[in-house]
Amino acid sequence: MKNHKVRQIVLPLITAMIWGSSFVTQSLSAGHIGCFSFGTMRAVPAALFLFLLVCVMRRLHPREKYSAEQKKTLLRAGLICGTLLTAAISFQQFGLESTSAGKAGFISALYIVLVPVFGMFFGKKTSGRVWLFVAVAVAGLYFLCVNGEDGAGFSRGDLSVFLCAVLFAFQIIAVDHYVGKVDGMELSCAQFVVIPSLSHRQMARHQPICSVL
């Protein structure tokens, strides 16, 4: 039980560090690589890595094969969560073309607030203590990410990144709904397979690879 609690703290912390540090790289590439191209190129290696990891875990921890209904559930979960994730990262990358990494980091992290707000419409109860922590987190993110110059005005890029936060919130709610029904690693793999499947069509139409290179 103790190891489980430590894992619940350490793994999200590592994820937050990786996710937060990526904003600078995304911002630098935003003026050179289109949002769909960027999404495709970051999702393909992630999908391949997760697929290999799933294969290794299945070999190390054999289990019964999925039933037809479980396969449908995994497919449905991957499509729903993957579509939301595709839209979220596309809006985020598009917004970074016209806003700073600091503002994008703050606005994207507003999904922390939106998850419990939207969750109430799906029957999720939220305690007052959680709302207090959310308020403190948002205030901290604001002072960390937004300085006086960045805080002036609300640009088209800011709106795009806010839509990203909304989509991230729904994606997290969807993952929470399905994660108890399917394997979490397989769901992650399915999501990252969906991203290039959707993004490459728009990339080929609006952002041909020759213009990226």
Model-based region annotation:
Residues 22, 55-108, 143, 211-213:
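Specific transmembrane alpha-helical segments of multi-pass solute transporters/efflux pumps
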Residues 50, 126-147, 165-168, 199:
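Hydrophobic transmembrane alpha-helices of multi-pass small-molecule transport proteins
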Residues 20, 44-48, 138, 169, ...:
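Small-residue-rich packing faces within the transmembrane alpha-helices of Major Facilitator Superfamily
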Residues 73-80, 126-138, 157-161, 182-192:
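Cytoplasmic-side transmembrane-helix entry/capping segments in multi-pass membrane proteins
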Residues 1-37, 83, 91, 150-177, ...:
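Glycine-/small-residue-enriched transmembrane alpha-helix faces in small-molecule transporters
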Residues 49-54, 111-132:
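C-terminal transmembrane-helix exit sites in multi-pass transporters
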Residues 29, 38, 42, 95, ...:
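Hydrophobic/aromatic residues within transmembrane alpha-helices
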Residues 34-48, 93-111, 154-167, 213:
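Structural signature of hydrophobic alpha-helical transmembrane segments
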